[in-house]
Amino acid sequence: MPKTPTISFVSLGCSKNLVDSERMLGLLGQHGYVLVPDAQPSDLVVINTCGFIDAARQESIGVIEEMLERKRSGAVRGVIVAGCLAERQKESLLEQFPEVDHVVGVFGRDEIARVADRLLGGLDEQRSLFRPAPVQAQDDRARLRITPRHFAYLKVSEGCDRFCTFCAIPFMRGKHITKPIEMVVAEAEELAADGVRELILVAQDMTYYGLD
């Protein structure tokens, strides 16, 4: 009988990133992966990183180093780095950390289960997955929530058009894309059915909703 694959997950950064983490966890669960606490041994660990400010980047790098040490000790078989730091640094992250097995950019999140399957199956010679920013909002339903049961974050848009000098968000998250109100309502209904009583709307630029 084949062993059930296990995965641990570290979610860093903002609430928007947490929504992405929950979406990836949901997809991995649908593909048969069992989530285990990150202190326990697992087949794979996914680190959903933040790359916004220097302190966040340093935190992400510290967690990558910690998980690579666990890989050396045999506690995990593979390390996948996803999210904003991966999107910002791309393949240079593999040069900095050659023991990382795969990097997945922000817009490759919905392919995380395929990446995990190929990695465990020894099929994935390519070590990076980066997709262009989509022209339509991504569907965040079918999440495995890691917030307390009574509340959840609901992402109503992605990206930003402002390109402020001090901010890297447009380079990591792309241009602003409004999530259609029908999709927002459908996600809200799904979350309410899952026991959520407090919805927190999040976006990179909430005041720009519907103006793109």
Model-derived regions, located:
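Proteins enriched for Cys/Gly/acidic motifs involved in redox and nucleic-acid/cofactor modification
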Residues: M1-Y209
